[in-house]
Regions:
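SAM-dependent methyltransferases
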Residues: 1, 106, 117, 216, ...
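N-terminal nucleotide/polyanion-binding subdomain common to many enzyme families
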Residues: 1-77, 243-267
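Hydrophobic/aromatic beta-strand patches that form the interior of the parallel beta-sheet core
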Residues: 4-6, 34-36, 124-126, 150-152, ...
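Short, solvent-exposed amphipathic alpha-helical segments in soluble enzyme
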Residues: 20-24, 141-145, 168
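S-adenosyl-L-methionine/SAH cofactor-binding core of RNA-modifying enzymes
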Residues: 63-90, 96-98, 104-107, 112-156
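Structured adenosyl-cofactor binding patch, chiefly the S-adenosyl-L-methionine
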Residues: 160, 164-211
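Internal, active-site/partner-interface "lid" segment
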Residues: 185, 197-236
Length: 272
């Protein structure tokens, strides 16, 4: 799988994805993640990506040209690289010199080595937007397709020219009913949730199915050593070795927690 992220602040999206399980997945060749500076596709010498809105309003709107040219460039040719963490906020040079911009973008996966993952697959374009459909585990699983390709667009300022949404974007995704300063953080959340569901990313194949929401319930309580701490003891059933009883206990506790914390996840007849 290959994921390209387009942002004015690529380091914000890239940094968390270079760590932990997602970073290891890239090193192992399970996914290739590239963060690009949208200004590399701006047309003027100032590398402008925003302008005042028609009709009058507060703030600035992101221009359509950089998005179209960036996505078409990434779709139509093998992308050179993704923005390296140390260079993400230090992009210089001519805005019209695409090759110069491309020479600065480096693969985040493993020491700059280009990974042939999803490069030839049709790219689906996702816009991170508070106006999008609410992101959940079901949508994460929908996008976690080995060998597929995603291009993730990050908004900023007051929004994006509607022509980008109408004619370039395949899906709008919101990570919640709140507004961030830019879409790079949302892109990192989206990418992490998707990539961890790819086969081989998590060490235990059962880890993802046991996650909260995967079964429609919140996750059951977890315990580890010591058996007793400050008078609080691990439930005896978890020490019994009876796998059937343990499974029943876990499902019951998951159901109880879901009823208490997120009853909206349950059918009407199971909320009481």
């Amino acid at each position: 799988m290959r994921i390209d992220i387009l942002s004015l602040f690529p380091a914000i999206a890239a940094a968390p994805l270079a760590e932990s399980m997602i970073g290891k997945a890239q090193q192992r060749g399970l996914v290739s993640i590239h963060a690009h500076n949208l200004r590399d596709w701006a047309r003027d010498k100032h590398r402008t990506t925003d302008d005042a809105p028609y009709g009058g309003s507060q703030g600035m709107v992101m221009k359509c040209e950089p998005f179209f040219e960036a996505v078409e460039s990434l779709r139509d040719r093998r992308p050179e690289t993704g923005t390296h963490l140390t260079e993400a906020n230090d992009q210089t040079g001519s805005a019209n010199d695409e090759e110069a911009g491309a020479s600065k973008r480096k693969d985040l996966s493993s020491g700059g080595e280009e990974l042939d993952l999803g490069v030839n697959a049709p790219a689906r374009v996702v816009l991170m937007s508070p106006a999008g459909r609410r992101f959940d585990q079901r949508i994460a699983a929908e996008y976690a397709v080995p060998g597929s390709r995603l291009i993730v667009l990050c908004g900023h300022y007051e929004g994006i020219d509607q022509r980008v949404i109408d004619h370039l974007v395949d899906d709008e995704i919101s990570i919640g009913d709140y507004v961030l300063t830019n879409g790079a953080l949302a892109a990192a959340v989206f990418t992490d949730a998707v990539v961890r569901l790819l086969p081989g990313v998590l060490g235990d194949a059962q880890s993802a199915p046991d996650d909260s929401f995967s079964s429609g319930l919140l996750e059951f309580p977890q315990y580890t050593r010591p058996v007793e701490y400050r008078g609080w003891r691990v439930p005896d059933v978890l020490l019994s070795g009876n796998h059937g009883a343990i499974a029943d206990w876990r499902r019951q506790k998951a159901l109880e927690k879901t009823r208490r914390v997120r009853p909206d996840l349950l059918p009407e007849d199971k909320r009481l």
